[in-house]
């Protein structure tokens, strides 16, 4: 298992607020918590940046982290990430902040220590562009949105 450096920026993390952990042996994501002093109410349509109290340094350029919404918050309450997916590059070392957006119909209150997002680690391949005049033909060709049908 790959080890990632984590810096605790808020002394409550690891005491009042648990460190991120995998819920089960098959979990892909680590839950990130709202490292808040007071509850924050999000009205419908509002968004805010929520600190996690953590910084990470992935260091390995073949890895990146992605912040994703928690499925229950999105489905039950309309709480998703303001940027839909957050991407953490391997050389970033600042605090992990979560952009939280209430796309629901009702106000939602984020409590201190509440699990608000999840983070996964993914492999990265950096591409190098090769300029060409034409591509080799494929069955799909230039077919775009909806080209392959619904069934």
UniProtKB/Swiss-Prot annotation:
Cofactor (UniProt): Mg(2+)
EC number assigned by the record: 3.6.1.23
Signal peptide: none
GO MF annotations in UniProt: dUTP diphosphatase activity; magnesium ion binding
GO biological process, one term: dUTP catabolic process
Residues noted as binding substrate in the record, renumbered to the chain: 70-72, 83, 87-89, 97
InterPro entries in the record: dUTPase (IPR008181), dUTPase-like (IPR029054), dUTPase-like_sf (IPR036157), dUTPase_trimeric (IPR033704)
Catalytic reaction annotation: dUTP + H2O = dUMP + diphosphate + H(+)
Known pathway: Pyrimidine metabolism; dUMP biosynthesis; dUMP from dCTP (dUTP route): step 2/2
Keyword terms, alphabetized: Hydrolase, Magnesium, Metal-binding, Nucleotide metabolism
Role description: This enzyme is involved in nucleotide metabolism: it produces dUMP, the immediate precursor of thymidine nucleotides and it decreases the intracellular concentration of dUTP so that uracil cannot be incorporated into DNA.
Name of the protein described by the UniProt record: Deoxyuridine 5'-triphosphate nucleotidohydrolase
Organism: Shigella sonnei (strain Ss046)
């Amino acid at each position: 298992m790959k080890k990632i450096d984590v810096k605790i920026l808020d002394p409550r993390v690891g005491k009042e607020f648990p460190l991120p952990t995998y819920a089960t042996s098959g979990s892909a994501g680590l839950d990130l918590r709202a490292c808040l002093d007071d509850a924050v109410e999000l009205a419908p349509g509002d968004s805010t940046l929520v600190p996690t109290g953590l910084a990470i340094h992935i260091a390995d350029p073949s890895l990146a982290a992605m912040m994703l919404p928690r499925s229950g918050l999105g489905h039950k309450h309309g709480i998703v990430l303001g940027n839909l997916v957050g991407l953490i590059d391997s050389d970033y070392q600042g605090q992990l902040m979560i952009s939280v957006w209430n796309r629901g119909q009702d106000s939602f209150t984020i409590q201190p220590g509440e699990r608000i997002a999840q983070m996964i680690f993914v492999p990265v391949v950096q591409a190098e562009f090769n300029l060409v005049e034409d591509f080799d033909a494929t069955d799909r060709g230039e077919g775009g949105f909806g080209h392959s049908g619904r069934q």
